[in-house]
A protein has these predicted regions:
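N-proximal low-complexity "stem/linker" segments adjacent to membrane-targeting elements
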Residues: 1-31
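Acidic donor-binding segment of Leloir-type glycosyltransferases
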Residues: 29-72
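Glycine-rich, basic loop-to-helix element that forms the pyrophosphate-binding segment
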Residues: 73-90
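Short aromatic/hydrophobic "clamp" motif used to bind/position activated sugar donors
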Residues: 95
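Conserved donor NDP-sugar-binding/catalytic core segment of glycosyltransferases
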Residues: 107-139
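Short, flexible, basic/aromatic active-site loop/helix in glycosyltransferases
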Residues: 142-162
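Acidic donor-binding loop at a coil-to-helix junction in glycosyltransferase catalytic cores
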Residues: 188-196
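Non-catalytic, C-terminal membrane-associated alpha-helical segments of glycosyltransferases
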Residues: 231, 248-312
Length: 312
């Protein structure tokens, strides 16, 4: 594979991957880099995907593309560690972070980021989802994301630029990562992005939200999305016990109010009695987003109660 000298690289596109076929994404991004005309590199870090054939196919495509590297971890390290590893490995002055379950939908994705590179320390391009549900087993995630997409227009994200932060599709100066890192204590799914946004704010890093969205294609099944939600709520509870993310999440803030009102015990009991009914709805073909919000709140309260009892 052709390589540029270390001092020649202007832009590094950095992709975290775990069990996703990212061949089309690599080909599309490589084409974008060629049209952009600058000197760049693409680096993929595979977080020890279990599907060997899929990984082999990704590596095969990466090796056929100039200035593209595909690395594989020897064990699963989590998104936060992987993003820090990629930032350290990158040779470009500017870094574009992308999740592997993304799809490029317009020809000026790279050029658009490059055009606005001096506007802020971090540019957030955003994301959107398909207009129709590709899988009836993914109805909960589809409905949840489509509702969230209404708030993902750049000007709406800009109202609260740090609280709307997601690392799914961002561009940053490499210098940023000498001051702010993804928190590597976030080993499991959830909240590493939000915590990074909090740290950016603390360090006075500027964020600018632009319309340069990628399509998110990784719609989990209802079962998978609920499992991920449970893991993310445990992550949030652990972070808050360490004094992090205080006041930075809606579900955590509401749980705090319920605790101040002396109703946490009652909420925990209600969850025990209604968990089965809630899951029956959420795993079905017509899940309610209202019930999903109720589930998350009650689940978080229960997780926190269990953690408090263990620590006593």
């Amino acid at each position: 594979m052709k390589r540029f000298g270390n001092n020649d690289i202007q832009l590094s596109i950095l992709i975290t991957n775990h069990n996703v076929d990212c061949r089309k994404l690599l080909i599309d991004l490589h084409g974008q880099m060629r049209r952009w005309g600058g000197k760049g590199e693409i680096i993929v870090l595979d977080d020890c995907s279990g599907e060997r054939e899929l990984t082999h196919g990704n590596i095969e495509v990466a090796e056929s593309l100039k200035c593209t590297t595909y690395l594989v971890n020897d064990r699963n390290r989590g998104a936060a560690v992987c993003r820090n590893m990629l930032a350290d490995r990158a040779r470009g002055e500017w870094l574009i972070f992308i999740d592997s379950d993304a799809e490029v939908t317009h020809d000026t994705f790279v050029a658009h980021y490059w055009k606005y590179r001096y506007v802020a320390d971090i540019l957030v391009g955003g994301l959107f989802h398909p207009q129709t549900n590709p899988n009836p087993e993914s109805t909960l995630r589809f409905k949840y994301e489509r509702k969230a997409d209404r708030q993902r227009i750049a000007w709406k994200r800009s109202i609260n630029p740090y609280s709307c932060f997601t690392a799914f599709n961002i561009m940053a100066r490499k210098e940023v990562f000498k001051k702010v890192r993804f928190d590597e204590t976030c080993k499991d799914y959830g909240y590493e992005d939000a915590l990074f946004g909090v740290e950016l704010k603390k360090h006075g890093m500027s964020i600018w939200h632009i319309d340069n969205a990628l399509k998110h294609t990784g719609l989990d099944t209802n079962e998978s999305f609920i499992r991920k939600t449970d893991v993310s709520l445990k992550t949030l509870a652990r972070l808050r016990m360490k004094g992090k993310m205080a006041g930075e999440s809606r579900v955590g803030n509401m749980a705090d109010k319920i605790e101040r009102w002396g109703l946490s015990g009652m909420a925990h009991m209600i969850f025990k009695k209604t968990k089965g009914i809630l899951l029956w709805n959420l795993k079905g073909h017509h899940p309610s987003l209202l019930l999903f919000s109720v589930y998350k709140l009650l689940k978080f309260i229960s997780i926190r109660k269990e953690m408090e009892s263990i620590s006593q």
